[in-house]
Regions:
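N-terminal Lys/Arg-rich, disordered targeting/topogenic segments
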Residues: 1-19
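Serine-dependent acyl-ester chemistry module
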Residues: 118, 173-368
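Structural motif
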Residues: 139, 145-156
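Short, well-structured alpha-helical segments in soluble
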Residues: 152-166
Length: 368
């Protein structure tokens, strides 16, 4: 005859009390294992980080922008465009009486094509030194070609760490075709949220390991030829060469610009660092559209082989544009005709031609 065993009330109570501990351990164990793996990968030297600022080769007391920082956005450094910020040396430990301003932006902010002394940083340095001759002025530029607001957002925490008195942002022209832009060869395949997640994860060695496995098995990274010196970096990375005004890609690029700037402003506000956001300029009168849509009516009106009078181009061109035509070439032809006739509306139509330009090397007017 079998004998039934009964669990004492004390034993049952003890097991019930231990269950929450088991649940906590079960939940935390995967994260602990991931942290251990992360630590082992770092100890073994796997992967790499590219900080925004690195010690200067001239003195360990000074820092400078990292000339290789753009590589942080690429799984393999060899696929990064050959760009980097200029060398600006500044003290690792900020002097109490110094004025430190950081300039952030793309190629225009970096001074292209005139170089650092023709850049906003160079001109601002001279103006502030003239205004405050007895102060130690440090203008530090982290601007470079091919980057857009995603890179600026990724930089902002490191900029805050060097204790700037103010941050000046001049950006917008690279938003569509810059790294991670919606029209770039280096565009992410995901949404804005996926891009932000990538920025958070890219320095984790586990994430880099997963990238390595993925690219080895399923995908070959985009290889862009930067050897042609006659082309600018931005020309070599353009993928979507036709982003129509108010299209889905156009709206997506505009939204990412606004959201990223708001996130940057929020981070600087929390750190109590003043932000100066500049309006952006471009040559609208002397630079015709790079790419334009067209139709038979437009082609006939602006056909150079059959020149029309300025008055006719203005009258018929404005009518077509008011009916919804988005030809950049038409808007530019109307603007030129208005300029010849001293029509004050010319500036508006030069701006419209830029906004309708399909190849978005220039920021749309809505960015201002």
């Amino acid at each position: 005859m079998s004998e039934n065993t009964k669990q004492s009330p004390g034993t049952s109570c003890s097991v019930d009390q231990q269950r929450p501990v088991f649940y906590v351990i079960a939940i935390l164990l995967p994260f602990v294992l991931l942290l251990i793996l992360e630590g082992l990968l770092r100890i073994s030297g796997f992967g790499k980080e590219y900080p925004l600022f690195v010690p200067s080769n001239y003195s360990q007391d000074y820092l400078q922008p990292n000339p290789e920082v753009v590589k942080r956005f690429f799984h393999q450094a060899k696929f990064a465009p050959p760009v980097g910020p200029d060398t600006f040396l500044f003290r690792k430990n900020k002097d109490p009486d110094s004025i430190r301003i950081v300039l952030m932006g793309g190629s225009t902010a970096a001074g292209f094509p005139y170089g650092r002394f023709g850049s906003p940083a160079g001109m601002l340095n001279q103006r502030i030194k003239a205004q405050f001759p007895d102060s130690h002025v440090e203008i530090i530029s982290v601007a470079m070609a091919s980057i857009n607001s995603y890179a600026l957002l990724d930089f902002v925490d490191e900029v805050i760490e060097i204790e700037p008195d103010a941050v000046l942002i001049y950006a917008g022209h690279n938003e569509y075709l810059g790294v991670m832009g919606v029209g770039s060869v280096y565009a992410s395949n995901g949404s804005h949220a996926a891009n932000l997640l990538f920025l958070k994860l890219k320095d984790w060695r586990i994430f880099q390991l997963i990238q390595s496995i993925y690219y080895a098995l399923f995908q070959t990274p985009v290889d862009v030829d930067h050897s042609d010196g006659s082309r600018t970096v931005m020309a070599s990375v353009a993928k979507e060469k036709a982003i129509a005004f108010d299209s889905a890609l156009f709206t997506e690029g505009s939204a990412q610009f606004e959201q990223n700037l708001m996130a940057i402003q929020s981070a600087l506000s929390i750190a109590k660092v003043p932000l100066y956001l500049s309006t952006i300029a471009s040559n609208e009168m002397d630079l015709p559209p790079f790419s334009s849509s067209s139709n038979p009516d437009v082609e006939q009106l602006i056909d150079r082989a059959k020149p029309r009078s300025n008055r006719r181009i203005i009258q018929q061109g404005v009518t077509l544009l008011e009916r919804g035509d988005t030809s950049a070439d038409l808007a530019y032809a109307v603007a030129q005709a208005m300029l010849d006739e001293s029509d004050e509306r010319a500036a508006d139509f030069f701006t419209l031609a830029k906004d309708y330009d399909l190849l978005r090397f220039r920021a749309p007017s809505s960015f201002n």
